[in-house]
A protein has these predicted regions:
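Well-ordered alpha-helical scaffold segments within catalytic/enzyme domains
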Residues: 1, 45-60, 92-106, 149-163, ...
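Alpha-helical scaffold segments in carbohydrate-active enzymes
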Residues: 10, 14, 53, 73, ...
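Carbohydrate-binding/catalytic loop surfaces
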Residues: 24-42, 89-100, 129-149, 186-207, ...
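Extended ligand-binding groove/face enriched in aromatic
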Residues: 64-160, 167-171
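Active-site cradle of extracellular carbohydrate-active enzymes
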Residues: 154-158, 166-218
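Non-catalytic carbohydrate-binding regions of carbohydrate-active enzymes
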Residues: 180, 184-188, 222-318
Length: 339
């Protein structure tokens, strides 16, 4: 296999040269671009994260230039604001902007993050015993994708701005998520509840990114409290995901079209962070590397593009979400080094 850094660079090159629209100055959803492209806000938050990954790995300023172009393009395409109907979409953007602040030191990013966060907090309501709503026009549907990322935001803002209210928000959101959407026996994270207004949990919806964001929330809380129980919980969630969702070789298979394309990359982002917290997670490092090897050896086509099935090259129309997920997985593996 080529060095992982070379594979990352090829995937990042394809991201920019195949999905960037020079006229609209924003990423498009598909390559080749379709005649009609809908606006999918949250994919752009992860595009920003992927560009930051490239900068962290290379220190090449063109990644920050691309980040700024995509940041401005996404803001413009969303109507001159980062506020949105879907709370979880705004949460992904907020996390990307907090990270941009950490990397660049530019206060405008965290100021924008706080502005969005203030709107996100309107998601909390008493339906289902509390928790953050998924979207503004369905306030009684509560799910992990709207809650765990919000807890991560709250804990990260607390660590940067030292506002006690942020810590309190994070604690109550995380508690709700663990109380309502975690299997207490296995630590597997369920997606959501009351989607159809019947109060039921969607036990059959099993997704990698739900595991990833709870790993992230528990890990951030462990950092704040120095409570190893939450770090251990993050490890249990990460390992249960491998047992429940990966194949016999430890490879996470295609999860579905459209939004599902992003899920694995999100999981691996937070699993990577977990591996940096303790030496207890060598097995999880190997899982990241295994999946990256499969992408590099089997999943990348001649254009450097990667589809949903990492075990084979994809041709025809490919979407941004699937490619981004692979880029993020490769970038996490690059941080672990070649082996």
């Amino acid at each position: 296999m080529k060095k992982i850094e070379e594979v990352c660079e090829r995937a990042q090159y394809a991201l920019w040269n195949r999905f960037w629209d020079n006229e609209k100055e924003v990423f498009v959803n598909h390559y080749p671009v379709k005649e009609e492209e809908s606006w999918i806000y949250w994919w752009h938050a992860h595009a920003l994260d992927a560009l930051l990954d490239g900068f962290v790995r290379t220190k090449e300023t063109y990644y920050l230039e691309r980040f700024e172009a995509e940041y401005e393009g996404a803001f413009r395409e969303n109507g001159g604001t980062f506020l949105h109907n879907w709370y979880d979409d705004m949460e992904w953007m907020t996390l990307a902007l907090i990270r941009a602040f950490d990397i660049t030191g530019e206060k405008r990013y965290i100021e924008q993050a706080v502005y969005i966060w203030n709107d996100i907090k309107t998601a909390w309501n008493d339906s289902c015993g509390g928790g953050m709503a998924w979207k503004k026009d369905q306030l009684d549907y509560k799910n992990t994708p709207a809650n765990a990322p919000a807890a991560i935001i709250a804990f990260r803002l607390y660590q940067r701005l030292h506002r006690e209210e942020d810590r309190e928000w994070g604690e109550k959101i995380l508690k709700w998520n663990l109380d309502h959407l975690m299997d207490p026996d296995t630590c597997f994270i369920w997606d959501g509840m009351n989607r159809l207004g019947d109060g039921k949990v969607d036990y059959e919806w099993k997704f990698t990114y739900c595991q990833g964001v709870v790993i992230g929330a528990a890990m951030e809380y462990a950092r704040i409290t120095n409570n190893k129980e939450y770090l251990d919980l993050a490890g249990k969630v990460a390992r249960r995901a491998v047992t429940e969702l990966a194949d016999a070789d430890g490879i996470f298979p295609y999860e579905g079209p459209d939004d599902c394309g992003l899920f694995r990359g999100i999981y691996f982002r937070y699993v990577y962070e977990l591996t940096q917290e303790s030496s207890e997670y060598e097995d999880l490092k190997e899982i990241i590397k295994k999946n990256a090897r499969v992408i590099a050896e089997n999943g990348m086509n001649e254009d450097g593009l990667i589809g949903g099935d990492w075990r084979q090259k994809s041709e025809g129309t490919l979407d941004l979400a699937q490619h981004l997920s692979a880029v993020m997985t490769l970038e996490m593996a690059a941080k672990l080094g070649d082996s």
